């Protein structure tokens, strides 16, 4: 969840940015300031791992968690580059998230607005350049072949 200022809400509304809603919130010790919860309503289809580039594969041994009966089986995970989704699944909103969750994605229009009006405390990264890990998969799973 993200809290945004009234200034940013007005900027997005004045520019008819789609795929988001705003709900007033109160931040303790800052009741005099107007902040809003940013809710993302835009969607795209699930993320397509097959189109991302594997940068590195890291193998790990079977591990027993100390003082427990938990055993993490031997396996590996991949460090990936690029985030892809079926373009036809995108509802064309300016703010959107994949149906299986994940980071907020914005259009070039939103990126340009945020930069032009010097909105702070925001990190923007091209989805083609995103680095992420595929998760840890035990040796005997299809995702680890």
Predicted features and spans:
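Phosphate/anion-contacting hairpin/loop surfaces
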Residues: 1-2, 6-145
């Amino acid at each position: 969840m993200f809290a945004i200022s009234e200034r940013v809400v007005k900027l997005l509304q004045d520019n008819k940015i789609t795929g988001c809603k705003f709900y007033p919130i109160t931040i303790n010790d800052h009741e005099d300031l107007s902040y809003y919860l940013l809710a993302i309503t835009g969607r795209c289809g699930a993320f397509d791992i097959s189109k991302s580039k594997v940068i590195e594969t890291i193998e790990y041994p079977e591990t027993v968690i100390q003082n427990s009966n938990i055993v993490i089986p031997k396996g590996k995970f991949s460090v990936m580059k690029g985030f892809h989704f079926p373009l036809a699944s995108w509802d064309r909103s300016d703010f959107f998230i994949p149906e299986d969750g994940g980071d907020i994605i914005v259009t070039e229009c939103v990126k340009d607005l945020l930069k032009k009006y010097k909105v702070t405390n925001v990190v923007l990264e091209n989805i083609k350049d995103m680095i992420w890990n595929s998760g840890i998969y035990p040796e005997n799973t299809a995702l680890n072949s």
